[in-house]
Amino acid sequence: MPNDHFSNGKKIAFTVVMFLYINLALTIFWILKPLKKSLFIGLYNGDQTFKLGSMEMLGSSAELLAKGMNLFIAFMLVVFLTLVSRLAKRQRLTYCCMGLIIAMTFCFSLQINDPSESTVWPFYWFGDLSISLMLAAFFSFLHDTVDLRNAKRLYGFIVLGAVSGGAVGSTYFRGWIEEMNNQQWLHTIIGIGVVICLLAFAAGWMAKSIPHHESKSGPNDVPKKKFNAAIEGASLVFKSRYLIAIAGIVGFYEITSEVLDYQFTAMIERFVPKKDIGSHFGTVYAIGNIAALVVQLCFSIFAAGFPKYRIHWILLALPLAVALSSLFFIIAPILFAASLLKISDSTFAYSVNQTGRETLYNPLSRQEKYVARAFVEVFIQRTGKVAALLIAFLVPMFLNTRNEAGQLETSLLGLQLLGGFTCIIVALWFYCVKIVGQKFESLECEQQQATTIALAQAQEQPSAGTT
């Protein structure tokens, strides 16, 4: 967002529009998340189990299989985003992604009030697909219009929109879960999607005077004609230690997040009555998102006043919170501790960690921002999920038992063992944060020097013309 093209008034207007854009995108996600999860877990409640050959599974274990399918979905999504981003930039990418989401939402709304097993599974996958599409379109637009000089100052406020959207969506769902049926929730999502397209149009109109923000091409950039979409992104990532470390942060977060989510879901499945499952999900999600809103608001104020903060400090907040809550759950495997696992994840993952992670892409070349980011944030993210699911799947397979009524029951010991595994992953996560922190500061210094030289040359040219 160079000052030559944007007045202060336009900067404020653009920031407000992008704030509302990400706010509504996350509102959609936090309506879909408890809705899809409660439908899925409620489908296999002990009386009815999911059968895979001779194996019987509860909803929490069947959910692991549903998430495992995300790897294939991720591959197709990387290809789709890479190909579409070559033809559509900024607001046009939003139109493509949001149009697909609206069409799919309408199709599900025709069956969602009385869903069969064949509807619940695709709807569960749709929940993950929709947020990946919305975030990819949003952050690609944002990175293409904001330069590094403004990124650390503005990203905090814009990501505050994401956090507030989470608080609005989860709180609204919790408050109206008894009043609205499933179809009405999906009709609400369609309406929000149309508004997002209008906001993208407004942001695109304001940003049309800004040339596509492009950092100097790096030596690792890959000619587009040489590779297909997925391989192109992988080639960029694995030739850069910086991008590998970013991929590590994303992958290790997804592993820990999925393990925490399984522990949380299994505890709810074991201790919460079926009729209260949706309400409990909504309550925990609302608490986590409201806490994230408070954290992000405080951070945004701090970042605006002190834009030269060190990036690695905010990237350490989430893994530290995950480690502490996991240790507490190992000591006391109760419903409160399991809920705290999810709250600690939501509080920092959707606030300062998201801000820091997105800022890491800003000093990269355009090809890395679009193609490498799509590979990391979609494919690596889903790969991390699948790795966690395979590990978590072993717990019910070997340790689950049956209660006195003959129903399957999740093993508390197995859930505690997963807590120990999480602590090991967090240690690797810390190492990746150290690498990106050092490299980001180096890239930041290089861009500041380049900006200083460019300004000096611009001042010398008028002087030379007058002599």
Give the role of each language-model region.
Residues 1-21, 46, 63-64, 80-81, ...:
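Intracellular loop-helix junctions on the cytosolic face of multi-pass helical membrane proteins
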Residues 120, 153-209, 279, 283-294, ...:
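Hydrophobic alpha-helical transmembrane segments
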Residues 313-352:
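C-terminal transmembrane helical hairpin of 12-TM major facilitator-type secondary transporters
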Residues 14-46, 50-78, 119-178, 225-236, ...:
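Substrate-agnostic recognition of the 12-TM MFS/MFS-like secondary transporter fold
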Residues 243-253, 311-318:
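Alpha-helical transmembrane segments of multi-pass integral membrane proteins
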Residues 60, 90-91, 148, 182-186, ...:
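Membrane-helix interface/capping residues of multi-pass secondary transporters
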Residues 297-314, 330, 394-402:
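Flexible, glycine/threonine-enriched loop-and-boundary segments that flank and lead into catalytic domains
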Residues 99-116, 320-334:
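C-terminal ends and interior cores of transmembrane alpha-helices
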